[in-house]
A protein has these predicted regions:
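Hydrophobic faces of well-ordered beta-strands that scaffold small-molecule active sites
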Residues: 160-164, 195, 201-204, 231-235, ...
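The substrate-binding groove and active-site-proximal loops of carbohydrate-active enzymes
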Residues: 13-20, 101-106, 165-184, 200-212, ...
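An acidic-aromatic substrate-binding cleft motif
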Residues: 128-179, 185-205, 391-394
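Gly/Pro-rich turn-and-neighbor structural signature
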Residues: 38, 135-146, 207, 215-226, ...
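Flexible loop/turn segments at secondary-structure boundaries
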Residues: 19-21, 62-64, 110-112, 169-172, ...
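Substrate-binding groove of N-acetylhexosamine-processing glycoside hydrolases
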Residues: 125, 148-151, 245, 319-518
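Catalytic domains of carbohydrate-active enzymes, especially glycoside hydrolases
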Residues: 180-210, 216-219, 223-232, 282, ...
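Contiguous, structured surface segment used for ligand recognition
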Residues: 1-153
Length: 518
């Protein structure tokens, strides 16, 4: 039985043709191995007499994988052409000078990255290793044999991620103190966290920051694209421009005009959208469509429902035409979303007297993002007649919320059985294209976020038959994140604290308590 020793003497085979983001993540995994064993793997570019090695590559970007497949030493057909899939194969004598190797092959960039991070998990490294400084248990060596051979699944949900929202003062002050601003140095650990959790999709912070300007310049977007993080913008920020950008460029004499008003200022607003699409067109994005008022407010607040629907219809026509001109004449090949949140939900469904946007040809191929009620209960799900919509459905879900009538933030209050109930139902009703959760400042939300993303990645495992699966999830999450620092006898107590704490907060959050509550 071939086996590979993770520890002293291990090498990482580094191809010149490897994708830059994959190389960067391989460096992170080498650091993980050093955390566990105390020894950092050596990077090699040939066999060089190495006994054991990790070989990694991406189909289409790896002569090494091509050669091994041609020689019959590895099989790639099980992952070829499959979104974000990877395989593990422990083999003997892959290259001259290498006795045994673990070959990590990815169908695409993220597949390879997930495979590399899966190696970290196999040796006991938590996805929170750097974000929360969760140190693994020391082991001199870890032996892996061909029992780790596997082919990963196609993720249950295509785009899985989170929204950094209402980020001041917590996330904002952290970014300012450690990095100076929400620049690429700040986003690097955020992207790492997302990818270690097998997410792939992000709505960046937007209260007083501009993702595509603060890198500085496009460095945030460049880094995201290098690492395979799919960027988008929140529900009220169309065409890859953050909500604060218009206030920076508006004014009398500005080419963008001085009114966030598509009726009064159509040329300026269209130019604003055009320039955003042009700026970010070379990156992997999901483009937000539609329009709300400034600062996430209702648009045309005193207009009729019919007038609002017609406005959004005209906006969609303009935005889709811009996408045809700038990105792809076949607009249906471009990932797009529209988020029906708050008052815009009525624009989609309409009323008995006024037809909504359901079935509008401008929404063909657009992912229709439904939402919860800001407090973790989904509002609507697709009917059987709606589920064939080209573009599919997504869900915008809240684990943190700043706004009326009651905010809840800065405390991780997510009760997993509630997430299970709402999101497994959403999946069963066909909401499978995008899952994104509002997690405020990220900090304190890691437990709920971990389950949300694991559920989105593999609903067959973490959806289970009923909510009892969340008890099993909590136990394994506690072992992974507290097992190195606490005695085994303490872990059930930690599980109980987390479960009871979140259960009680699900019944009554701090912000909703007053002198007359009881």
């Amino acid at each position: 039985m071939p086996q590979i020793t993770i520890g002293k003497g291990l090498s990482f085979y580094e191809e010149a043709q490897a994708l830059p983001g994959v190389k960067r993540v391989a460096g992170m995994v080498k650091q993980d191995i050093e955390l566990v064993t105390g020894v950092s793997p050596v990077g090699i570019t040939s066999g060089q007499g190495s006994g054991c090695a990790v070989l990694y590559g991406t189909i289409g970007h790896s002569p090494m994988l091509d050669a091994l497949e041609a020689q019959g030493k590895i099989a790639l057909n099980a992952i070829r052409g499959k979104w974000e899939c990877y395989s593990f194969q422990v083999i003997e004598n892959p290259l001259a000078g290498i006795g045994t190797a673990l070959v990590i092959a990815g169908n695409d960039k993220r597949g390879t990255i997930y495979g590399l991070f899966h190696l970290s998990e196999l040796i006991g490294v938590s996805p929170l290793v750097n974000w929360n400084h969760v140190l693994p248990r020391h082991q001199d060596t870890v032996i892996l044999d061909d029992r780790v051979n596997m082919v990963s699944r196609v993720p249950s949900v295509k785009y899985r991620g989170f929204f950094i929202n209402d980020e001041w003062p917590a996330f904002g002050n952290w970014a300012k103190t450690h990095f100076g601003s929400m620049n690429a140095a700040c986003y690097a650990p955020v992207f790492e966290l997302l990818l270690r959790m097998k997410g792939n999709y992000l709505w960046p912070a937007m209260w007083n920051s501009n993702f595509s300007l603060d890198g500085p310049g496009l460095e945030n977007a460049v880094l995201a694209d290098e690492l395979g993080v799919v960027m988008s913008t929140s529900h009220h920020e169309p065409c890859m421009r953050s909500g604060q950008e218009y206030s920076m460029v508006r004014g009398r004499g500005s080419i963008y005009g001085d009114a966030w008003d598509y009726i009064a200022n159509p040329e300026g607003i269209t130019r604003f959208w055009r320039d955003g699409l042009t700026r970010n067109k070379d990156f992997e994005n999901v483009i937000t469509l539609g329009m709300r008022g400034e600062n996430d407010t209702a648009i045309m607040q005193h207009a009729t429902l019919e007038e609002n629907i017609q406005l959004i219809r005209n906006v969609l026509k303009t935005q889709n035409q811009l996408i045809r001109e700038i990105i792809n004449p076949d607009v249906r090949q471009v990932p797009r979303q529209i988020v029906f949140f708050s008052e815009t939900e009525e624009f989609f469904y309409g009323s008995k007297e006024t037809p909504g946007l359901i079935g509008d040809p401008e929404l063909d191929g657009v992912t229709l993002m439904l939402s919860d009620n800001n407090h973790g209960s989904t509002r609507t799900l697709p009917s059987p007649e709606m589920r064939s919509h080209p573009g599919g459905y997504g869900m915008y879900y809240h684990m943190d919320m700043h706004g009326g009538p009651h905010s809840f933030e800065w405390v991780g209050a997510t009760y997993l059985p509630k997430v299970w109930e709402e999101m497994t139902a959403a999946y069963e009703y066909g909401v499978r294209e995008i899952w994104v959760t509002n997690i405020g400042d990220i900090g304190t939300q890691e437990f709920g976020l971990s389950y949300f993303l694991d559920l989105a990645y593999d609903i067959d495992v973490w959806g289970g038959q009923d909510a009892a699966i969340t008890t099993q999830y909590t136990a394994q999450w506690v072992r992974r994140n507290f097992g190195a620092a606490f005695a085994p006898a303490d872990l059930p107590r930690i599980e109980g604290i987390i479960t009871d704490y979140t259960r009680l907060l699900a019944r009554r959050k701090h912000e909703k308590m007053g002198e007359n509550t009881y």
